[in-house]
Regions:
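Membrane-embedded alpha-helical signal segments
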Residues: 1-168
Length: 168
């Protein structure tokens, strides 16, 4: 069983050193606080905003006759989803491109598959042939490069932070 949502958020932020890649969106639906959590380089922001956020905004008190968890999982039909009840499972899915919906007061969470696709296929570097090892090259844009790293290393211990050096 999951803990309270605020405790889960604090624990997750502490374990990931509050990196900016993991997005926490807080919303209120039918008077209940929910969190939408996703790992930005690994997910499709279009899928999240077009389908998940839009579906959640369309929920009204009239539609929520049973519990909110069941109503949300029934209304978001475009995705494969799972109901989870363990914190470790939540972290597992978060680092694999899934979006997590936590509902205040619920002991379970909804996990939706919102994996993003890389803009183009990654090809091996043409001037550096390697016999063994990874064939990826960091010649893409920033978000794609971060996504490549996070696809290979799926852990809370990988922290990526943006810093500004010098003046513009």
């Amino acid at each position: 069983m999951l803990e309270e949502t605020d405790l889960i958020i604090k624990k997750l932020k502490k374990e990931t050193n509050e990196i900016s890649d993991i997005v926490y969106r807080e919303k209120y639906i039918c008077g209940k606080k929910i969190y939408i959590i996703y790992n930005e380089p690994l997910t499709s922001s279009d899928k999240i905003s077009e389908f998940i956020i839009k579906s959640l905004n369309e929920l009204s008190k009239d539609k929520v006759k049973e519990n909110l968890l069941k109503t949300i999982s029934n209304n978001i039909t475009n995705f494969k989803y799972e109901i989870i009840d363990k914190y470790d499972t939540l972290c597992f899915y978060l680092h694999r491109g899934f979006t997590i919906i936590l509902i205040d007061g619920e002991k379970e969470a909804i996990v939706l598959e919102t994996k993003g696709s890389i803009k183009r296929s990654i090809s091996p570097p043409e001037n550096e042939n390697a016999i063994r090892g990874a064939k990826d090259a960091f010649i893409e844009d920033y978000q794609t490069n971060i996504g490549l790293i996070k696809k290979r290393i799926k852990t809370n211990d990988l922290w990526i932070d943006n810093i500004t050096c010098g003046k513009y």
